[in-house]
Amino acid sequence: MTTKTTMTEHVAAYLAERSMLGFSISGPGAQLLKSFAGFADGQDCGTLTSDLVIHWAKDQSRTSHPFTWAGRLAIVKPFAAYMTRLDPATEFPATPIFGKSRRRLTPHIYTDGEILGLLAAARALQPQGELRSAVFETLIGLIAATGLRISEAINLRCCDVDIEACCATVRMTKFQKSRHVPFHRSVAEALGSYLQVRGRFVRQEAEQAFFTVAGGQYLNKRTVHGVFQRLRAAVGIVPRGSYPHVRIHDLRHTFICRRLERWQAEGCDIDNAIAALSTYVGHAKVSDTYWYMTGIPDLMAIAGSRFEGFALGENGHV
């Protein structure tokens, strides 16, 4: 007699296939998918149905909010597509019955004065003139100047930063891809100054962490966030976005917004510019970059003004 394959076994096979294709299977999404499989097996349901997945998404959630339920449905959706290859009777809700599964909150956009204040506060970290102050001043400056993710910056190795070529190589990023990130000569000069300080405390080796405070070890992300919050408090920066706290990641948002603001003001071909910027900052989808045009009030105002000019025949393009 043939033994029926359980939903847990189907999920394990699906995750193994995703892993072979280079996708991460260790995040919260994988754990939620395993939770769904366990629930389905407990219901003795051999087939994935709309009723089953809705029941799990809503009634098995710890949060009574449609946004959370929609997110749980979104986790199962790719797996449901996979299951249709194995079981034609597989069902999944055809419409987003709980609404959108993703929402983007407006980030804090730093002023130039706030960024300069953060750099000055980092430079004043005790003991002054030591590696710690140089690390945090340079780290904050690099993220502000290039829009790197914090994880990308702290995972740089010495061999990844080519100061002469003004380019950093970011390896195996958030989406398991690598990319080159060119930077301005002024950034190269700041990085070179940092390396001179670093060299007094740590021997430079190609495979060592570029940003390090002890023994060539990589910075801990939690430590970086903790130090940043102390610097933010020292400067007196208060949040202007939708988040309750100002974050170091907002430096990345600020870089993207300032670049788009400049291109908008200069009347550039914004579609081509956004495509290039999306690649530069490592967005998985160009739509993630377009979001800033509608999600940031300052950019919306510029875009609206340009569209008004276009409608009145003052501009050749929007």
Language-model-detected regions and their locations in the chain:
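Conserved catalytic core of the tyrosine transesterase superfamily
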Residues: M1-V318
